[in-house]
Regions:
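Zn-dependent metallopeptidase/amidohydrolase metal-coordination segment
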Residues: 125-127, 202-251, 256-259
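Acidic/histidine-rich catalytic neighborhood of metal-dependent amide-processing enzymes
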Residues: 1-64, 106, 110, 114-120, ...
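Active-site-adjacent substrate-binding region
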Residues: 92-109, 116-118, 165, 175-223
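Short, hydrophobic beta-strand segments
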Residues: 73, 129-137, 170-177
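A glycine-rich, aromatic-flanked flexible loop/lid motif
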Residues: 67, 119-132, 153, 157-169, ...
């Protein structure tokens, strides 16, 4: 916010030439709802950038396809002294479900364009257990495979323990913006020019995550993401420097200048 507002202050104070500019801040990005109710016609822009990336000089226009899955296991509790061939321990079935997923497709074992299953939460007892996953992949077909795999595991366990033992609910979250950015690649080309004018080398890597720009792009507002200059996001060591924030503001001003010509 500070980088964007500082750029706006400089434009107003110095009277720099610019076209129509639209500025907005979305409050719920970190829970995946930042752009779900965003009023694109009311916003009034044809193209946009989000400022939500990593190191200053970064341009992100390819991100994960994303889904979330909730796995619910229904057990059958009886006295453990007479449980043989009768008890279905929901917590054990939950561990069996998770154990059926590939170990090398977890966040801690993947990088680059490799997708993953991420177990975010789990809890349970003998009668009921729940697993919460997020699924990620840059390739939409590979994400679909991951979703199908969860259903196949559920089918196998239901065949083993009885129908209805395992239920899987899957909800799509966001999609890779690349398809929507390609027809408007001037956004990337002009961002490159703006970064180079600021004395930096553009860095373009697929995002191992998502941004509101992905949702906005699929809703009709092409919107790549720019670096903020921050580090160690989503942790107690998250930080940035004033110098990097100044550079991020300089890049925004350069973009405005490029589009004003």
């Amino acid at each position: 916010m500070a980088e964007i507002l500082t750029a706006a202050e400089i434009l107003l104070a110095e009277g720099r030439p610019h076209g129509k500019l639209c500025i907005a801040f979305t409050p719920d990005e970190e829970i995946g709802e930042g752009a779900s109710l965003f009023d694109i016609p009311g916003f009034g822009a044809d193209f946009a950038y989000t400022v939500d990336g990593g190191d200053v000089g970064g341009i992100e226009y390819e991100n994960f396809n994303a889904a979330a899955a909730t796995v619910t296991i229904h057990g059958f509790s009886v006295h453990p002294g007479s449980a043989k061939d009768t008890m279905i321990n929901a917590s054990n079935v939950a561990m069996e479900f998770h154990g059926a997923l590939p170990v090398m497709a977890r966040p801690e074992t993947t990088e680059g364009r490799q997708g993953f299953y991420h177990l975010c939460q789990m809890y349970g007892d003998v009668t009921t257990a729940k697993l919460g996953y997020i699924l990620r992949d840059h390739d939409a077909d590979k994400l679909q495979y991951k979703k199908d795999n969860l259903l196949h595991i559920a089918d196998y366990l239901n065949g083993k323990y009885g129908p209805g033992t395992v239920e899987v609910e899957i909800k799509d979250s966001y999609r890779n913006m690349l398809e929507k950015i390609k027809p408007h690649f001037h956004l990337v080309e002009n961002a490159r020019k703006a970064i180079e004018k600021a004395g930096l080398t553009p860095e373009e890597v697929p995002v191992r995550g998502g941004t509101d720009g992905a949702t906005l792009s699929w809703k009709g507002l092409p919107c790549p993401n720019l670096g903020t200059g921050g580090f160690n996001f989503h942790g107690v060591c998250e930080c940035t420097t004033v110098e990097r924030m100044d550079k991020a503001t300089e890049i925004l001003l350069n973009i405005v200048e490029i589009y004003s010509k």
